[in-house]
C-alpha cells in the first residue's frame, strides 16, 4: 500500500475532475511490479481494479479513489459477497484509505522538514517555531498511531478471529452468508462508520 500511495500521490493531489481511471490503473500496475504484490496469484491481481467515486466540488483525486475487487462473475463468491456486503467493504476501504493518507502525508511532511530545516534554523525566532512544529507533528503522529493500532487490533483482528471461529462451525450456505454479514457489521460498528454513528463520524 505504501508503494501504491507513493506512486499515486502526485496524480491524486490533482482536482478530482482531472482524474482518469485508466491513468490510475497504469500506476497501480507499476506499484504491483515494484512491490511484493507481484508474487500474488495472477488471477487475484487481475480482479483488483480501480474505481472512482462520484466527486463533490473541491474534491481531489484522494477523495474519489477506490480499490475494488471483482467477484460478480464468480458464482460461489458472488453468492456470499452480495452487493450490500461489497458496498460495506467499500465503506471500510474508504475509512482505512483516509487513515493511510493522513499517515502518508505526515511522513512526507516530516521528510520535507528534515530536508529544509537547516536553511532556516539560524534565523532569529525560527528555532522556537520549529520546536513547536515538532511537538505538533509528534502529537499528530501519536494520535494516528493510536487510531491505527485500535483499528488493527481491536477492530480488524478481533473481527477476523471471530469470523474464523464461525467458519469452523458453519453448517450451510445461509449460515456462511450470515457469518460474512456479521463480520462486516462488526468492523463497521467498532470503527464507528455504520449509519448509527454517522453524526459522530462526521464530527471526528
Stretch-by-stretch model annotation:
Residues 1-204:
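Extended, charged interaction scaffolds in large complex subunits
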Amino acid at each position: 500500500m505504501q508503494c501504491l500511495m507513493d506512486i499515486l500521490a502526485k496524480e491524486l493531489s490533482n482536482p478530482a475532475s482531472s482524474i482518469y481511471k485508466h491513468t490510475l490503473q497504469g500506476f497501480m500496475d507499476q506499484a504491483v511490479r515494484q512491490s511484493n504484490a507481484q508474487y500474488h496469484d495472477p488471477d487475484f491481481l487481475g480482479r483488483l481494479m480501480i474505481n472512482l467515486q462520484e466527486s463533490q466540488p473541491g474534491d481531489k483525486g484522494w477523495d474519489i479513489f477506490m480499490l475494488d475487487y471483482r467477484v460478480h462473475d464468480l458464482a460461489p463468491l458472488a453468492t456470499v459477497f452480495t452487493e450490500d456486503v461489497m458496498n460495506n467493504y467499500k465503506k471500510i476501504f474508504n475509512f482505512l484509505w483516509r487513515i493511510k493518507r493522513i499517515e502518508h502525508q505526515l511522513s512526507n511532511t516530516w521528510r520535507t522538514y528534515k530536508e529544509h530545516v537547516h536553511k532556516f534554523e539560524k534565523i532569529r525566532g525560527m528555532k522556537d517555531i520549529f520546536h513547536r512544529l515538532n511537538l505538533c507533528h509528534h502529537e499528530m503522529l501519536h494520535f494516528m498511531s493510536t487510531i491505527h493500532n485500535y483499528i488493527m487490533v481491536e477492530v480488524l483482528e478481533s473481527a477476523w478471529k471471530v469470523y474464523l471461529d464461525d467458519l469452523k462451525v458453519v453448517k450451510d450456505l445461509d449460515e456462511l452468508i450470515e457469518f460474512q454479514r456479521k463480520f462486516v457489521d462488526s468492523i463497521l460498528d467498532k470503527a464507528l462508520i455504520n449509519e448509527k454513528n454517522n453524526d459522530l463520524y462526521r464530527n471526528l
